[in-house]
């Protein structure tokens, strides 16, 4: 359960980072 939660958190963090990077690159 803890491992799954960590994976989800990592995925969300990565997605947010990519979104911010893409936004800055486009903007």
Swiss-Prot record:
Primary gene name: thrL
Report the protein's function.
This protein is involved in control of the biosynthesis of threonine.
Organism field? Escherichia coli O157:H7
Instruction: Return the similarity comment.
Output: Belongs to the thr operon leader peptide family.
Kindly indicate whether the keyword Amino-acid biosynthesis belongs to this entry. yes
Q: Mind listing the UniProt keywords for this protein, alphabetically?
A: Amino-acid biosynthesis, Leader peptide, Threonine biosynthesis
GO biological process: one example: threonine biosynthetic process
Protein name per Swiss-Prot or TrEMBL: thr operon leader peptide
